[in-house]
């Protein structure tokens, strides 16, 4: 079926001509200022009727130039399918919507170049401020942005960059989970599968893991520490490489994200090793939680982030910025889910 080409959009000048008024008068009416300038009701009705008939919409960017605000917030996250980021974005979008703000979300795919492109496109749309989960630790690019547009950081933050952020307080919970798992299961080895070490959450989670081993009195073997990125395929491949090196499964694994856990479970399923979880020959723990873990026939202890509280804290920063109030960073506590 042929798709009909849309009709040419009517201009403000054409509406004014059809209504028999000046372009200035038509602009005042269509921007909701007709009554303020005491334009007669019948004139306002005539202009509005013509605009509606032709599907005319006032230029939001032109209005924003006058108001010095667009009421649009730009947000760049690394993975739209990631449960944590998706949950936070969903709550934040509703909070913005309820206050008359539009949250526009873009994805970086955890790629610095894609992050830059997404930011540039949002800046082209004159967003009032940016919320980003940076894919790198280099402050130079952001130093250029903040000269003109304010930036808040979510989940991750760049050191030596004076930006307010909202992150999870992950290190204490990870340390407690690791220490208690070692003690309860009598572990002599414990592998760590993490994402890019250049990212602030990766460093925090690794430090929490190491702290937990110290608390449990288990000496760290550097061969236990593995890093790639946070995609499920990386969890799969890291476990495959570990098994190839050891010739067996390790005693225990901590995955630094639920996405990495997905990859680990896929490896175990494809290699018919899920029974090792049931027999207790393999112990899995993870950062990030999902309700699905409650339905499994084996135990996977997890650490849940409070995505609603994270979104609320971030929205609080947005509101404070719009009110020109002082901004402060927030760390939101995590919760351990024992199973």
Spans of model-derived segments:
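N-terminal helix-turn-helix DNA-binding module of bacterial transcription factors
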Residues: 1-69
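Flexible loop/hinge segments that line or gate small-molecule binding clefts
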Residues: 132-173, 178, 198, 259, ...
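Structural motif
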Residues: 104-124, 175-176, 224-246
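Short, solvent-exposed amphipathic alpha-helices that sit
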Residues: 84-98, 173-177, 200-219, 234, ...
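An alpha-beta-alpha
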Residues: 176-218, 222-223, 328-339
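Flexible loop/turn connectors
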Residues: 244-339
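Short beta-strand segments enriched in small/hydrophobic residues
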Residues: 23-28, 65-79, 189-196
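Hydrophobic alpha-helical segments within soluble ligand-binding/sensing domains
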Residues: 164-192, 207-211, 232-240, 261, ...
